[in-house]
Amino acid sequence: MATRRALHFVFKVKNRFQTVHFFRDVLGMQVLRHEEFEEGCKAACNGPYDGKWSKTMVGFGPEDDHFVAELTYNYGIGDYKLGNDFMGITLASSQAVSNARKLEWPLSKVAEGIFETEAPGGYKFYLQDRSPSQSDPVLKVTLAVSDLQKSLNYWSNLLGMKIYEQDEEKQRALLGYADNQCKLELQGIQGAVDHAAAFGRIAFSCPQKELPDLEDLMKRESHSILTPLVSLDTPGKATVQVVILADPDGHEICFVGDEAFRELSKMDPKGSKLLDDAMEADKSDEWFATRNKPKASG
C-alpha cells in the first residue's frame, strides 16, 4: 500500500480569525490554498450543513509531501460541541514552542520536552520541543477507539496500513502507509467514542482505480460507507473522486483519487491573500448581532 498517502485532517472552525492566528503564527504553518463555496459539499466535507462555507489548507509545506490541516468554516455556525473522538496531533517543532511562549499562547508541559496546547475550539496539539527528524514536522494524529483489536483489523487488514507499534497494556497502536508519512495512532478508551458535533475527518489518497474496489470491499465486509464514490468540483480547479467511509467507531475517512488530488492540491501563491480578504469581508458575526440572534450551534 505504499501508493497510499496520509493527506490531512479536517477541523470544523468556529472562529476563523483566531484559528488562523493559531495555525499560522503559533504553529508556524503557511496557508497553502483557500477556497470559498456557496453551498454545502456533496460529500459533507464541511459537515452536515448546506450553507456558505470555506476551506483553508494550512501546513508546513506542499500537500504532495506534507500532512496538513483542512480548516472548514461554516458562516452560519458559531459553535461545535467537542466529543472525545479526536485526541490530538503531535508535531516536532521547537519553533512552535518558541512562538507559543512569545505570543503567550497557553502551553502545559506533559512530559520532558513535550507540551500540550489547544487550537481555538479545544482541539489538542502536542508540541515536541525539538527539530523534526523528517521534512514534515507533523508526526501523528491520535484518535480514540473503543475496541483496539476491532480497529486494528479494520485499519490494517482492510485498509492496508502497516502496524508500526502496538502496546496491549497501554491499549495503543501506531499505523501508517509509509515510514516518512504522518502516522495514525489509535488509543483505546473506556466506553463509547462520542463524536458530538465537532467531529473531524482524516483523508488519504490512493490511485483512482482503487476507489471502486475499496467501496466494494467495505460492502462485502458490511462496514459503513457514508458517501459512495462521487465526483467533487472545486470552482476553477481539478475535479476529484472520493469515497467516504467510517471505521467501527464512526471516525470519518476520506479516500480520494491521487492523480486528480495532486492537481487540486497544488499550492496557490494567492491563498493567504484570498483567506485574509475573505476574513475581512466576513460580516456574518455582525449580521447575527444586529438581529440579536446567536449563530447556530453545530
Swiss-Prot record:
This is Glyoxalase domain-containing protein 4. It is found in: Mitochondrion. The keyword Repeat applies. The gene is Glod4. Coiled coil: none annotated. Interacts with NUDT9. One of its GO terms (cellular component) is mitochondrion. Its main location: mitochondrion. Residues 5-130, 137-258 form the VOC domain. PROSITE patterns: VOC (PS51819). The modification N6-succinyllysine is found at residues 109, 273. Belongs to the glyoxalase I family. PANTHER family: GLYOXALASE DOMAIN-CONTAINING PROTEIN 4. It holds the Pfam family GLOD4_C. Keywords: Mitochondrion, Phosphoprotein, Repeat. The keyword DNA damage does not apply. It comes from Mus musculus. The modification Phosphoserine is found at residue 131. InterPro entries: GLOD4, GLOD4_C, Glyas_Bleomycin-R_OHBP_Dase, VOC.
